[in-house]
Amino acid sequence: MTLSMNLGADSYDIIIEHGALAKASEYLNLNRKVLIVTDSGVPAEYADTIAAQCKAPTKIVVPEGEDSKGFPTFELLCRTMLENGFTRTDAVVAVGGGVVGDLSGFASASYMRGIDFYNIPTTLLSEVDSSIGGKTAINLGGVKNIIGAFHQPKRVLIDPDVLKTLPPRQIANGLAEAIKMAATFDAELFSLLETEDILANLDTVIERSLMIKKSVVEQDEKESGLRRVLNFGHTIGHGIESYEDLHGLYHGECVALGMIPMSGGEVRERILAVLKKAGLPTDLHFDADRVYEAVTHDKKADGDQIHVIYAPEIGSFEMKKVSLAEFRQTIKEAFAQ
């Protein structure tokens, strides 16, 4: 299956195909210098399979986890390209999850003011969400994604077969982003997640999630309006991640927790049920004041107000700009339950 992201001069294809990794050179221009970036948690054969199809590959394996998404690793990537004589005609290929994609994308956006970038996601979270849309970033001072750029990939290659090596917790981590999109845009997908065997329907979950995000990004590439809806669960989720000092909980797990206060009544109960079915945490046992302090550093804060996304009904959303005082009370009430 091929989806086309229509962004004018920055348009690109999203290839979804079982076994695509072994024939990546049919879809990606690897006949040049290529920096392949992966991490220690990704099976080595994935990056090696790509390297074997490249004319002049250079491979970097960064440590697994959020600690790699910072300036030291970013500098390592840029310095490696510099020392190996990379020019604007060369490319970076990310083979990994969200951390690898964000880091590699930002390095490719920055080196020589931008070189080609290909994304080959190997986690469910990156396959359903972070591999498309052009957001690239690194962390600073415990704040997620505070330094970054919009830099669209030239192509995204999704091979669902790589998910077979993922542990159940990583599958659940990715499902959080699919639940987020279903809760705000696609009641039919949400119903599938509620009633069907999720693992048996992963291909459908991936395709439907990507179609939602593709449509949103095409309408609002730089997140000035509609794309903010994709932050459902992320404002409080990022606060929890920062509170946790980027350790302990995965990104999707934090997003799952962040969705709970942004819904109510029957909608909240349905979201809670799907989160539990997917194996995601639902216990808000954090210090509300510390989470709030972390949230005030969030990119969605605007002076003494903050942009928030609510799910009033499954498959719909409401964008609001509320005072920080009101938002603080929302957090306190949710975390007190």
Which sequence ranges carry the predicted segments?
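Short glycine/serine/threonine-rich phosphate/pyrophosphate-binding segments
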Residues: 99-106, 127, 238-239
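A glycine/threonine-rich phosphate-anchoring loop and its flanking beta-alpha core
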Residues: 15, 21, 29, 106-196
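Active-site segments that bind and position negatively charged phosphate/pyrophosphate groups
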Residues: 192-290
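ATP/NTP phosphate-donor binding region
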Residues: 1-91
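Solvent-exposed alpha-helices and their adjacent loops that cap or buttress functional pockets
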Residues: 6, 85-87, 110-111, 139-140, ...
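Phosphate-handling active-site elements
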Residues: 83-89, 112-119, 242-253, 268-269
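C-terminal charged capping/lid subdomain of soluble metabolic enzymes
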Residues: 11, 176-178, 267-337
